[in-house]
Amino acid sequence: TSLPAQEAFDIEYWLLEEAKLRRMPAEKELARQVVIVAGAGSGIGRETAIRLSREGAHIVAVDVSEEAAKATAAEITSRAGSGIGIAGSGLSACGPAVGLSADITDRASIRAMLDGAAIAYGGFDSICVTAGVFAPSDKSGHIPDARWASTFAVNVTGSYLVADEAAATWRDQGLKGSLVLTTSANAVVSKRGSLAYDTSKAAANHLVRELAVELAPLIRVNGVAPATVVQGSSMFPRERVIGSLAKYGLPYAESEETAVLVARLAQYYAERTLTKSPITPADQAEAYFLLVGGRLSKTTGQILAVDGGLPEAFLR
């Protein structure tokens, strides 16, 4: 008897489909993962968003500046191509990336951003919080109360609010994920001129550990602790660069290009490290990639230093 038509079709069709699948390239490491990067408009956040997207992640680029967030998302989309968008949502071209604004010191703003991420992608897997501020002392060496409060609002409370709002969604999803906060080598090194910043980063270090306990076992929580990142950082405008050069007795001229001054200061900081090389946003992005992905799936409650080797910041 002849083979039934359906059986003959099944034999030929599925063999061909399996052959096609075998010829397809392997999925990238973060394929089908949705990662929110808070602070993605510039510096470490922007570099992290781009790095994770190259590994296949869908990126929700978030910044207090909507324009900056959308610029990062547009850069990612220009490399990978746009998606079909969602009719009526206002979130068009949300294939590889979407840009949203949020103030991480405001719970309602965070909630609206997370809802926007859910509209775009149905949920999210991981969050990287790279947003931060540096508030220097005034000329007398004093830190005004408002400046102290705003430093802690962004560098500590902001990360807590993001984690607290995201926790409900993570619990509802029931899927494993990762939260990566940004601390600093300054968290363990005392010095003059950065009292509010350094103290806030010390608090952020312990926030990582506390959140790791609170969000276990579904969510791993870790921190990245950069040394001073000058190049590509929004925290180092020209005025601060010149102020730092003057503070350390390094030569400079007002007529010099900002890029030249930045490079000089970056190299000064580099000479204080064991590797003698400037710390860049790209260096930090590699750490976020490792902590978000599955390579360190048993690591939580830890601080990963990317500081070029600062002996004074070694664990005691």
Where do the protein language model's features map onto the residues?
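Conserved glycine-rich cofactor-binding loop
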Residues: G41-S42
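Catalytic Tyr-X3-Lys loop
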Residues: F124, P144-Y160, V180, Y197, ...
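Short C-terminal tail/terminal secondary-structure segment
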Residues: S137, Y288-F289, T300-R316
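Substrate-binding pocket helix/loop in short-chain dehydrogenase/reductase
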Residues: D138-S140, P144-A149, Y269
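Active-site loop immediately N-terminal to the catalytic Tyr-X3-Lys motif
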Residues: G141, V189-L195, K276
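Active-site helix of classical SDR
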Residues: A163, S200, V208
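Residue(s) in the substrate-gating loop at a strand-loop-helix junction
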Residues: S184
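Short, small/polar-rich loop/turn modules that mediate ligand/substrate recognition or access, typified
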Residues: A216-R220, T299-G301
